[in-house]
């Protein structure tokens, strides 16, 4: 294990020697500037003075990359990793097996991504070319494995999986993702630090491991079709892209068949889509994979003859907007409200048929004047009826007197009065 130069009296004297890679299997490549990564991540430097005391622990960490053959296949084509504002995980997954640790000692396992060179790239004529000088880099986040710190026995039995490491191009990121520049080449580095406390990381012994086949170029969309094909073939979440030709047609038939079963299935049962069983520690929506395109359903041909359906479940049809009912004239209001004044009923009916006349009923003054007119009209009608009755009673005696003075006509020139008048 190597000592932290910040723990020495003259750390600048060790800077020329930091260009040499750390020995051991899988090591080498860029200098292990773990200290500067810690400073950028916000770790305070350790105390300057004498080197830390030897704790007497003897270990020789060794790291082996899982799926190394797959990484080599990608490296031959030029590995690309998609970066997004919301963060994207890397594929192939960066998983390692660790050995040579002290079983009882505590260890931190960390990773950072550093620029592989000082160039900017472009994809032209099916190959990557240097397009100019690299853009300034944002401060990199030192990703600490969630299981840290753990005993050496834990790391040697479980290994380390960095599937939760996310890449982004959002310079305003607040989630702790690793910020990268598009069209730039980066190299992942793995650090094994023997330390039990996070605050002592800056002056603890460590070892850095670099695997050249994990080098990649950050992109916002895949440039090389070969890389896309490799991701589709090996990513467990991209199985939907593996069908081609007749396979696509068969997939559409299965999709329509499932849709038909969903419409004809009883209410208690629902049609479920086939599910895949990916790696338990990986997520479907966040892995570095092509976006699954939604296949459009084929237009169904309308049959010339109608057929009766035996299914009791109503089929889903297109949504039709609600329409207002046709205009109809309501019945006369005096038929329903016989005891109300006719003028009020007339105004009410006019207000219901024509809203512009509703102001007469909504205004209190108009309603009061309408009521006063109604009362005045009712009182005048009562007075007219009373005067008519008095005039009829006054005319009746005169009619009787006239009837007394009228003599009935004689029958045959002889009347009973004539007999009584004679002696």
From Swiss-Prot:
UniProt keyword Ion transport present: no
Biased composition (Low complexity): 302-317
Polar residues bias: start-end ranges: 261-283
One cellular component term from this protein's GO annotations in UniProt: nucleus
Superkingdom of the organism of origin: Eukaryota
Gene Ontology molecular-function annotations: core promoter sequence-specific DNA binding; DNA-binding transcription factor activity; DNA-binding transcription factor activity, RNA polymerase II-specific; DNA-binding transcription repressor activity; enzyme binding; RNA polymerase II cis-regulatory region sequence-specific DNA binding
Knockout-associated phenotype: RNAi-mediated knockdown results in 70% lethality at the larval stages. RNAi-mediated knockdown enhances the larval lethality phenotype of the nfyb-1 cu13 mutant.
Thylakoid keyword on record: no
Region of interest (Disordered), residue spans: 238-324, 384-423
Purpose: Involved in the transcriptional regulation of genes required for the development of pharyngeal muscles derived from the ABa lineage. Acts as a transcriptional repressor and binds to T-box binding sites in its own promoter to negatively autoregulate its own expression in neurons, seam cells and the gut in order to restrict its expression to certain tissues. May function together with the nfya-1-NF-Y complex to repress its own expression.
Annotated protein name in UniProt: T-box protein 2
């Amino acid at each position: 294990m190597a000592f932290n130069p910040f723990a020495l009296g003259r750390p600048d004297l060790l800077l020329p020697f930091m260009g040499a890679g750390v020995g051991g299997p899988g090591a080498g490549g860029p200098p292990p500037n773990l200290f500067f990564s810690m400073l950028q991540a916000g770790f305070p430097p350790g105390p300057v003075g004498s080197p830390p005391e030897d704790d007497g622990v003897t270990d020789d960490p060794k790291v082996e990359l899982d799926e190394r053959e797959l990484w080599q296949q990608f490296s031959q084509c030029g590995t690309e990793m998609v970066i997004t504002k919301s963060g994207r995980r890397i594929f192939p997954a960066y998983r390692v097996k660790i050995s040579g640790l002290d079983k009882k000692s505590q260890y931190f396992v960390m990773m950072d991504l550093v620029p592989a060179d000082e160039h900017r790239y472009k994809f032209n004529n099916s190959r990557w070319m240097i397009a100019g000088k690299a853009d300034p880099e944002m401060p990199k986040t030192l990703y600490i494995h969630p299981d840290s710190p753990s005993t050496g026995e834990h790391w040697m039995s479980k290994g380390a999986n960095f599937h939760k490491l996310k890449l982004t191009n959002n310079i305003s990121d607040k989630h702790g993702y690793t910020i990268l520049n598009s069209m730039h080449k980066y190299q992942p580095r793995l650090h094994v630090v023997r330390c039990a406390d996070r605050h002592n990381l800056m002056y603890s012994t460590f070892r850095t491991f670099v695997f050249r086949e994990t080098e990649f170029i950050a992109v916002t969309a895949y440039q090389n079709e070969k890389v896309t094909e490799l991701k589709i073939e090996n990513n467990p979440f991209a199985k939907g892209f593996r069908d081609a030709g007749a396979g696509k047609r068969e997939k559409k038939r299965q999709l329509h068949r499932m849709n038909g079963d969903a419409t004809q299935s009883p209410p208690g049962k629902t049609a479920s889509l086939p599910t895949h069983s990916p790696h338990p520690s990986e997520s479907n929506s966040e892995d570095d994979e092509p976006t699954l395109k939604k296949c459009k359903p084929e237009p169904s041909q309308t049959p010339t003859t109608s057929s009766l359906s035996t299914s009791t479940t109503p089929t889903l049809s297109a949504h039709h907007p609600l329409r207002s009912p046709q205009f109809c004239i309501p019945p006369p209001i005096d038929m329903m409200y016989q005891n109300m004044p006719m003028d009020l009923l007339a105004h009410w009916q006019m207000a219901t048929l024509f809203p512009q006349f509703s102001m007469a009923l909504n205004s209190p003054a108009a309603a009061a004047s309408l009521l006063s007119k109604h009362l005045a009209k009712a009182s005048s009608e009562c007075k007219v009826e009373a005067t008519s009755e008095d005039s009829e009673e006054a005319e009746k005696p005169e009619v009787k007197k006239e009837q007394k003075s009228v003599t009935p006509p004689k029958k045959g020139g002889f009347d009973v009065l004539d007999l009584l008048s004679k002696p």
